[in-house]
């Protein structure tokens, strides 16, 4: 891809219907405007956009892409106009903006609007490259920055609108020759109009020139008085409106107070009657329970072996924003959770089941947590890694780790691995210090998933899983996937498992590296995976955008249970001593056990 503002002409420039500007996008996401009120903005792509970036409803590049309840992406306007999905015929309801697709579209290169003109086909909203115009190609997301300062932008002479239209690059030369330069004191009555030479001569004899300081001071005072009067008018109007509202509220309160006293009297009588009835019912229930206990004591209890079912045993509440990561410190029965509220909470999972402490230090969303020894490492959208001492729960070091958010962390062999945009950094752990050992490159997108198992590091990015030898830090194998970016990875004794952006879970044989199965069932991005292994079986847990957790038996590759207790997307998982912890966008952490 060429850099922004690089002169380039494409012989196969593609003309498509114009996209809306960013400001119009935000307005039209709230209001639905008729077609005739839209003015097409010139848009000519330098190269043919990918078909994956085109809406299946309007067949054009996405405009304000959104994800619908069926899991597909459409233009917001198309999704609001259409009733059913063209792929699976499901009802269309907008769920959330598709930020990832919007960012990809913003990276596409287009021709400057001042280098385009209407195509000769006569179709409205269709444009082609103008060889006489601006030669630059720019990223779609940066078009405003370039076009606002483009030398080919049409401008008007500031001296006289009757001057012929100009290009910005010709304005300075025109001003030197313009015959319509007015005296700076024209607003006070000076009638002079001339060119640059006569303008300078006129100023020497202009009767207003000697009074310019006095005139300016007078203008300033008039302006201040006008502003003060406007403010007073606003204050008077506000006070009048408040006075009217207060009068209305007082009248309403008087009326409602009388009604509430009447209702209160009625409720007191009714509560007294209900209380007597509840006491009678409680007495009857106690008698029945005593009778049932007596009958049970006369019998013999038999054994019952139910199917292993996970149930929600409790909920940790305290975060003020979505929970994005979880980590368990088994030696102390502590659970750490990172959130959009920029904090890390420490939960006791053994005795009190309460928040022990809230760790503060990050300036952005906490996206990743990892434990090595007695140290907790946290990665954030503020591009830093903070080192915490678990013994006293204090911050001991802060490292500026990446130029972009730190998405994931994992430790192995006394090294810490951190994932960000197109890079994995390897850090030697030396006490409380992190020494950069190497940066692993050659990655095609965000690294959102890292797992260390035995002597290998597994990293997930866009449709790719790379396997690295931890001892040599060399990439020894690449697994190709489908379904968009890899958001989660888990490794069992026999399988490599990954969750993707487009709802899928792929499974590979760990020895042959051959894909053996694709697990389906989720209807949203698979954000997290976790494994619980016993001598008898291995279970994989998946957490998804669709607010559910699924339990998969790796013996027969089927879903044995679906857990639905969260009120938002489930984003993080952690396991400890047969227990499963799940964090979600609803700001809670839930505990699951058999």
UniProtKB/Swiss-Prot annotation:
Alphabetical list of Gene3D superfamilies matching this protein: YVTN repeat-like/Quinoprotein amine dehydrogenase, Zinc/RING finger domain, C3HC4 (zinc finger)
Annotated PROSITE patterns: WD_REPEATS_1 (PS00678), WD_REPEATS_2 (PS50082), WD_REPEATS_REGION (PS50294), ZF_RING_1 (PS00518), ZF_RING_2 (PS50089), ZF_TRAF (PS50145)
Biological or metabolic pathway of the protein: Protein modification; protein ubiquitination
Enzyme class: transferase
A Pfam family annotated for this UniProt entry: WD40
Keyword terms, alphabetized: Apoptosis, Cytoplasm, Cytoplasmic vesicle, Metal-binding, Nucleus, Phosphoprotein, Repeat, Transcription, Transcription regulation, Transferase, Ubl conjugation, Ubl conjugation pathway, WD repeat, Zinc, Zinc-finger
First and last residues of every WD repeat: 318-357, 361-398, 401-437, 439-478, 481-518, 521-562, 565-593
Residue numbers spanned by region Disordered: 1-33
GO MF, one example: zinc ion binding
Tissue: Ubiquitously expressed. Expression is relatively high in heart, liver, kidney, testis, prostate, thyroid, and salivary gland.
GO cellular component labels: cytoplasmic vesicle; cytosol; nucleus; perinuclear region of cytoplasm; ubiquitin ligase complex
Compositionally biased tracts (Low complexity): 15-29
Quaternary structure, from the entry: Homodimer. Interacts with MAP3K3 and promotes the kinase activity of this enzyme.
Protein name as annotated: E3 ubiquitin-protein ligase TRAF7
Source species: Mus musculus
């Amino acid at each position: 891809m060429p850099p922004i503002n690089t002169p380039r002409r494409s012989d196969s420039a593609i003309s498509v219907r114009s996209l809306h500007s960013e400001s119009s996008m935000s307005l039209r996401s709230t209001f639905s405007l008729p077609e005739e009120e839209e003015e097409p903005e010139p848009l000519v792509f330098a190269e043919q956009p990918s078909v994956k970036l085109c809406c299946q409803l309007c067949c054009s590049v996405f405009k304000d892409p959104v994800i619908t309840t069926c899991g597909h992406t459409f233009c917001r306007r198309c999704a609001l106009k259409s009733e059913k999905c063209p792929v699976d015929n499901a009802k269309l309801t907008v769920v959330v903006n598709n930020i990832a697709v919007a960012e990809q579209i913003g990276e596409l290169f287009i021709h400057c609007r001042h280098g385009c003109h209407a195509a000769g086909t006569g179709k409205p909203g269709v444009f082609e490259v103008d060889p006489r115009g601006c030669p630059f190609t720019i990223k779609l997301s940066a078009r405003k920055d370039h076009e606002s300062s483009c030398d080919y932008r049409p401008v008007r002479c500031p001296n006289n609108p009757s001057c012929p239209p100009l290009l910005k690059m010709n304005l300075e030369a025109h001003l030197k020759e313009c015959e319509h330069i007015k005296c700076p004191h024209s607003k006070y009555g000076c009638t002079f109009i001339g060119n640059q030479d006569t303008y300078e001569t006129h100023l020497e004899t202009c009767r207003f020139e000697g009074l310019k300081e006095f005139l300016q001071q007078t203008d300033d005072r008039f302006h201040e008085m006008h502003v003060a009067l406007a403010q007073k008018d606003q204050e008077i109007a506000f006070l009048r409106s408040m006075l009217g509202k207060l009068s209305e509220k007082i009248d309403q309160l008087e009326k409602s107070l009388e009604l509430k006293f009447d209702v209160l009297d009625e409720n007191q009588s009714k509560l007294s009657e209900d209380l007597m009835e509840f006491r009678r019912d409680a007495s009857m229930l106690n008698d029945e329970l005593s009778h049932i206990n007596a009958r049970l004591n006369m019998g013999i209890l038999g054994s019952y072996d139910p199917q292993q079912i996970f149930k929600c045993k409790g909920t940790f509440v305290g975060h003020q924003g979505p929970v994005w990561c979880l980590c368990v410190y088994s030696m102390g029965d502590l659970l750490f959770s990172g959130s959009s509220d920029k904090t890390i909470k420490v939960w006791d999972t053994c005795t009190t089941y309460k928040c022990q402490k809230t760790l503060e230090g990050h300036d952005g969303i906490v996206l990743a947590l990892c434990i090595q020894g007695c140290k907790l490492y946290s990665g954030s959208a503020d591009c830093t890694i903070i080192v915490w001492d678990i013994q006293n729960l204090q911050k001991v070091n802060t490292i500026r780790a990446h130029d972009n958010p730190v998405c994931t962390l994992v430790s192995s062999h006394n090294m810490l691995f951190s994932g960000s945009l197109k890079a994995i950094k390897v850090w030697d752990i030396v006490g409380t210090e992190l020494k950069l050992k190497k940066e692993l490159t050659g990655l095609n997108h965000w690294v959102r998933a890292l797992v260390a198992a035995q002597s290998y590091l597994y990293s997930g990015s866009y449709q790719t899983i790379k396997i690295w030898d931890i001892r040599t830090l060399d990439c020894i194998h690449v697994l190709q996937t489908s379904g968009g970016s890899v958001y989660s990875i888990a490794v069992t004794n026999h399988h490599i498992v990954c969750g993707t952006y487009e709802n899928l879970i792929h499974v590979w044989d760990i020895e042959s590296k051959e894909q053996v199965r694709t697990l389906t069932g989720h209807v949203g991005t698979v954000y997290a995976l976790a494994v619980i292994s016993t001598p008898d079986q291995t279970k994989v847990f998946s957490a998804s955008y669709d607010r559910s957790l699924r339990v998969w038996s790796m013996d027969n590759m089927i879903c044995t249970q679906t857990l639905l207790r969260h009120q938002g997307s489930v984003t993080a998982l952690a396991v400890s001593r047969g227990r499963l912890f799940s964090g979600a966008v609803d700001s809670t952490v839930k505990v699951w056990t058999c």
